[in-house]
Design a protein with these regions (language model features):
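Generic hydrophobic, amphipathic alpha-helix propensity
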Residues: 1-3, 19, 44-48, 52, ...
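Helix-turn-helix
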Residues: 5-43
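Hydrophobic/aromatic residues within well-ordered alpha-helical segments
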Residues: 37, 48, 52, 73, ...
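Hydrophobic alpha-helical connector segments
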Residues: 43, 54-87, 138-141
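Secondary-structure edge/capping motif, primarily at the C-terminal ends of alpha-helices
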Residues: 59, 88-92, 148, 152-155
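All-alpha amphipathic helical-bundle segments outside canonical DNA-binding/catalytic cores
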Residues: 68, 106, 124-140, 158-163, ...
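Short secondary-structure transition hinges
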Residues: 82-117, 124-128, 132-136
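C-terminal peripheral helix-coil segments that are non-catalytic and often amphipathic
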Residues: 117-121, 125, 158-195
């Protein structure tokens, strides 16, 4: 419930009174479970990350190959970010640096490792170009996440986050895929990649 409130109103504008009222508890009860608003946000971020990790691992397990896995994870990300105002991330960085750092650590460890593994898998499956350096491409991909969420680069609501992710996926998957990979995409995902 608190995550919904944060997503709708932003981290900065949600007060302790709002949280207690929305959760249907007194502020006193709230403080029994959480030290302060920062503690709640940190806990919420950690729970969200744990949930997303499991979903990404499920996508990787269910994917028949690297392309299916990448598209499946991207679909999940698009769904999660479809109506998120990027200023939410700015607020998190400015007003809740500990929670922001947890997100950054997650991005540079878990997301990086998954992208790196996906690239290696795609090369091994002969779906991705063999002349790619997985370390460089994975680092580029992770670094581009901040740009996708930057209100200076992509002012909201002119650029919706789900649209940005779709365009970046289209751009990246075509850059990763070799001829065999592009053929596979056209046969299996042409509508999705080009919609």
């Amino acid at each position: 419930k608190s995550n919904e409130l944060f997503l709708n109103l932003g981290f900065k504008s949600v007060t302790m009174d709002d949280l207690a009222r929305e959760l249907g508890i007194s502020k006193k009860t709230f403080y029994i479970h959480f030290k302060d608003k920062n503690d709640l946000i940190l806990t919420s971020i950690k729970l969200k990350i744990a949930s997303e990790k499991q979903i990404c691992q499920d996508c990787a397990t269910a994917g028949a190959n690297a392309i299916e896995t990448l598209i499946s994870i991207s679909d999940f990300i698009i769904e999660q970010l479809s109506n998120v105002n990027p200023t939410l991330f700015y607020d998190l960085q400015k007003y809740h640096p500990e929670a922001w750092q947890v997100m950054q650590d997650h991005k540079w460890k878990f997301v990086y490792d998954n992208i790196h593994t996906n690239i290696l898998q795609g090369i091994k499956e002969d779906l991705y170009r063999s002349n790619l350096d997985p370390k460089i491409i994975a680092r580029y991909y992770v670094a581009s996440i901040d740009n996708m969420m930057s209100p200076e680069i992509f002012p909201w609501p002119e650029f919706k986050t789900d649209s940005i992710v779709k365009q970046i996926l289209r751009f990246q998957i075509r850059g990763l895929a070799n001829e065999e990979g592009i053929k596979y995409i056209k046969e299996n995902f042409n509508t999705k990649i080009n919609e």
